Amino acid sequence: MAFFSRLNLQEGLQTFFVLQWIPVYIFLGAIPILLIPYFLLFSKFWPLAVLSLAWLTYDWNTHSQGGRRSAWVRNWTLWKYFRNYFPVKLVKTHDLSPKHNYIIANHPHGILSFGVFINFATEATGIARIFPSITPFVGTLERIFWIPIVREYVMSMGVCPVSSSALKYLLTQKGSGNAVVIVVGGAAEALLCRPGASTLFLKQRKGFVKMALQTGAYLVPSYSFGENEVFNQETFPEGTWLRLFQKTFQDTFKKILGLNFCTFHGRGFTRGSWGFLPFNRPITTVVGEPLPIPRIKRPNQKTVDKYHALYISALRKLFDQHKVEYGLPETQELTIT
């Protein structure tokens, strides 16, 4: 009985720490968005709002210059419960020399990119031990850093904007041994994810290759096997009113917020139930062999296309070498759109 009690407690903690992830960001984001205008206009606490905005203005460039990472935050115990929920694993195939900088391109995006977050924005899977002397940064939308409190939280985990200025700073002005992790397919790729799928939005995604050429950063392919398995995405049949409504809503959502809206679901609080918790399915992020890239200040399109093709070839090789080991059939092919 004691064993089952401990087991249930572990599962409960894992579920809680996964469940809190998105609400925490929403809550932290809502506090300044709602309270700052209220304090400014209607409250005697208006000096707090003024100080918050003054600090944001004073500290505006920090997130584009490496941020303020915290080893303490990255090592929080809650991330280990988060890791064990799926579980999430990081696999190294080749060493990364601290003499170089790297762009680690990750695929697929999935719905929420759990693999990238746990493996590179925390120490839950031991990235500092697996890749010693390498400092990882995870790229995300710059608008997140416009929100007080939230920006401090994500910066503490080594998250940075995926903007040109921020990436160039990390890859050219912060020494060597830096690795910027970018989920290249972005939100457009999230619309392609579903269990059993291995479809990437990559043919027209060449900005990361151009950035590698401009900075001389080595390109590293990585693939998170299982990322597409943790949620079911619903796409209604073409020609139905549900599909028309879904597509209209998604197009409007993207125009207003610049984001793609996915209709998805996972499990509930009990196994077998319906809800918005991800399914307990393993996610394994395999990091491949670095592809040396020459530094060219103004690469032409032909050069960008050349190294983009080399990158895709290396990614396909990585996928084919590991797909069976991590749950995909031998016949599964990587589809690139």
UniProtKB/Swiss-Prot annotation:
| Domain of life the protein comes from | Eukaryota
Catalytic activity annotation? 1,2-di-(9Z-octadecenoyl)-sn-glycerol + (9Z)-octadecenoyl-CoA = 1,2,3-tri-(9Z-octadecenoyl)-glycerol + CoA; 1-O-(9Z-octadecenyl)-glycerol + (9Z)-octadecenoyl-CoA = 1-O-(9Z-octadecyl)-3-(9Z-octadecenoyl)-glycerol + CoA; 1-(9Z-octadecenoyl)-glycerol + (9Z)-octadecenoyl-CoA = 1,2-di-(9Z-octadecenoyl)-glycerol + CoA
What keywords are assigned to this protein?
Answer: Acyltransferase, Endoplasmic reticulum, Lipid biosynthesis, Lipid metabolism, Membrane, Transferase, Transmembrane, Transmembrane helix
Would you name any one GO CC term?
Answer: endoplasmic reticulum membrane
Presence of keyword rRNA-binding: no
Q: What are the recorded GO MF terms, alphabetically? A: diacylglycerol O-acyltransferase activity; O-acyltransferase activity
Mind telling me which Pfam families this protein's record contains? DAGAT
EC class: transferase
Tissue specificity = Expressed in all tissues tested except pancreas.
Q: Which residues cross the membrane?
A: 22-42, 102-122
Where is it located? Endoplasmic reticulum membrane
This enzyme's EC code(s): 2.3.1.-
* Biological process, per Gene Ontology: acylglycerol acyl-chain remodeling; lipid metabolic process; monoacylglycerol biosynthetic process
Q: How does it sit in the membrane?
A: Multi-pass membrane protein
- Its main localization is endoplasmic reticulum
InterPro entries (UniProt xref): DAGAT (IPR007130)
Q: What does this protein do?
A: Diglyceride acyltransferase that uses fatty acyl-CoA as substrate. Particularly active with oleate as a substrate. Has no wax synthase activity to produce wax esters. Able to use 1-monoalkylglycerol (1-MAkG) as an acyl acceptor for the synthesis of monoalkyl-monoacylglycerol (MAMAG).
Family according to the record: Belongs to the diacylglycerol acyltransferase family.
Q: What is this protein called?
A: Diacylglycerol O-acyltransferase 2-like protein 6
Report the source organism. Homo sapiens
Q: Which gene encodes it?
A: DGAT2L6
